[in-house]
Curated annotation (Swiss-Prot):
This is Fructose-6-phosphate aldolase 2. It catalyses: beta-D-fructose 6-phosphate = dihydroxyacetone + D-glyceraldehyde 3-phosphate. It comes from Escherichia coli (strain K12). PROSITE patterns: TRANSALDOLASE_1, TRANSALDOLASE_2. One of its GO terms (biological process) is fructose metabolic process.
Length: 220
């Protein structure tokens, strides 16, 4: 199982990388734009924050296959080992096929159906990212989409893996993992929600109170 943070906030990546067993960081054009930093400046900083073994993802902006391929090569040249995110459109599928032959690892993104995700995997994408909450918002079932896609990949494209995205709650993320999803990427607020459990703090305070009452200290 691989856990990623979905952000371009370098300071938060540095903070949470010390706590979470993260495999890397995912970004998209909206996330990069929100950072107000040039992609060519923020990507190296993110890579440094996650270390050489961390996996970094960045997305192309072009709408045609050739443009996607050219941008993917620029990203690869800037950050060796980067995974390039390609929207799963007709042109995106063509680009994924070309990039597979070029040896550039891709993730098929903006996936709203299991069929769409399977096509990305068959085209050569190593990762496929279904948008869980966005599927729900359109009246679909995001978790079921993940389940169906996971089953399809196991049967027909075992070299590819689901990297589920678009979460609003920790429950959605856990349900994805229970559905057999192999990797997820969490926005900062959802990652933080996993840590912020009031009952835990209350339990710790009770331990400290009892220990201090007995021994006059809160240390061993």
């Amino acid at each position: 199982m691989e856990l990623y943070l979905d952000t371009a906030n370098v300071a938060e990546v540095e903070r949470l990388a010390r706590i979470f067993p993260i495999a890397g960081v995912t970004t998209n054009p909206s996330i990069i734009a929100a950072s107000k930093e040039s992609i060519w400046e923020v990507l190296p900083r993110l890579q440094k924050a996650i270390g050489d073994e961390g996996i970094l993802f960045a997305q192309t902006m072009s709408r045609d296959a050739q443009g996607m391929v050219e941008e993917a090569k620029r990203l690869r040249d800037a950050i060796p080992g980067i995974v390039v995110k390609i929207p799963v459109t007709s042109e995106g599928l063509a680009a994924i096929k070309i990039l597979k032959k070029e040896g550039i690892t891709t993730l098929g993104t903006a996936v709203y159906s299991a069929a769409q995700g399977l096509l990305a995997a068959l085209a050569g994408a190593k990762y496929v990212a279904p948008y869980v909450n966005r599927v729900d918002a359109q009246g679909g079932d995001g978790i079921r989409t993940v389940q169906e896609l996971q089953t399809l990949l196991e049967m027909h494209a075992p070299e590819s893996m689901v990297l589920a995205a678009s979460f609003k709650t920790p429950r959605q993320a856990l349900d994805c993992l229970l559905a057999g999803c192999e990797s997820i990427t969490l926005p900062l607020d959802v990652a933080q929600q996993m840590l912020n459990t009031p009952a835990v703090e209350s339990a710790i305070e009770k331990f400290e109170h009892d220990w201090n009452a007995a021994f006059g200290t809160t240390h061993l």
